[in-house]
Amino acid sequence: MEQKSIKGTRTEHNLLASFAGESQARSRYTLFAKKAEEEGYMQIAAIFRQTAEQELQHARQFFGMLEGGMVEITASYPAGVVGDTATNLAEAAAGEHEEWGVLYEDFAKVAQDEGFPKIANAYKLIAKVEQMHEQRYLKLLEHLKSGMTFEDEQPVEWMCINCGFTIMAKAAPKRCPVCGVDQGWFERKAINY
């Protein structure tokens, strides 16, 4: 059975807008990572970079569903500046929310209505990832605003992401006693293996 073409459909326009949006998010997050690094937040920088790579994969998925040729779209994208890390986290969370809570829900419905169930499903699955991105950015922002990026109310295990040194404490050391990097290189140790 021949697959239905997306040429000239709203779904085609939505896929291209999604590709452009994911590509731009990747670039913004790369810029935000550099700023976080400059401000001494290495974990936040790493998370921005990881998310940027995930956005590249989303862009790749949307691009791969297109059928070629020139397509004209009209869409709005953030035209802001790189702010401080707190501002960047807030902007990133808002962008992720718009993707999963507004755009991709609508795009999935359009794709379904136009007879593209696989594309609709891709939007639904990617929306779940974008929701997780938003939650992660909001948690990092909460820690940053409350002064809990490098502190906790209870002792936790802190790990230097440069050398692997760990210590159980309420706050990360100001400097790593093993490799000498500053506190910005510490994060709460995650056991995810």
Regions found by a protein language model. Give the residues of each.
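Non-heme di-metal
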Residues: 1-193
